[in-house]
Amino acid sequence: MYRFISSKSLKDVNKAYLARYKKKESFNKKFAEAVDECPEIAGLLPPGTKGIDLLTYDFSRLVDLYYDYNKTLNDLHDDARVKEINDKFKAIFNYDSHREKIRRFLSDPNNGFEIHNCVYCDLNKVKGYTRRDGERNLEFHADHVLDKGSCPLVALSIHNFVPSCPTCNEPPLKGVRPLGNTKADTLKISPKSATNKFDKDVKFILNITDTTIPDLELFKTNDGWEIDFSYKDGGYWQTVSMFELKERYNAEKTYFGEFLHRKKNLDIKEYIENSIYTEDEILELMFCYERNKLNHTPKEKCRLELLEQV
């Protein structure tokens, strides 16, 4: 997982996003009417809050709103009333009516978001491509970090979206579940959070499970070794568990094993003596460090961290 935050200022992103909504007055009127009809929710919002304001709440405010909204509805102990409230706000914050607009906004480089691989697993490229007619084909799902079904108020909030692959976005993996079970956890481990440190606090590790296999033969097959994780912050195990990253990365051992076998059996001095290339050039040819970095090749964090251990 990696952070997905615009390189633009929050002010610029918010302004550009709101410019895509042309019927703000009508939107705000419907929202005000719904709040009047749902006094249970009114207390969750600062006085004078307009419906359009929620579309640009920063992620920490969205987390507060999401958890407070769900607690308020759960405390009602009235399923019929909960459904009534949810239905009112779902009709206003209708994601299906704005789905393509949101995906186009996220994929527009002018808005400062970089989309290359699924932010949850980094196993699949979701960048898309340009069709022959010049139109951009978008291959990613705009996933709600905070579920729109259980809190419709966050359904259109631009700081609640990340690009994901279908596998991560749908059940039985993430589906409608939030990342983390508390406000603190969700703020810490979500890709929309500036405090997310998955890249530094979680490392892929190489476990040798069969020490009888000779070193130079170990990575010829997928037997005798596995990919696992180590944590500086144990909170991130929730991410690894939710997206079944251990199982999914081990399913890719053939890919990683080719590079591990190559490095394990590499005699760089012999290559240099019999080549016109420098050591750095040989390593680049064999392991594509710079090329993969430039191309944002999927699975690269795992590949590099495993190679460091061989």
Residue locations for each model-derived region?
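N-terminal accessory alpha/beta regions
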Residues: 1-105
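Short, flexible, mixed-charge glycine/proline-rich loop motifs
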Residues: 102-114, 153-158
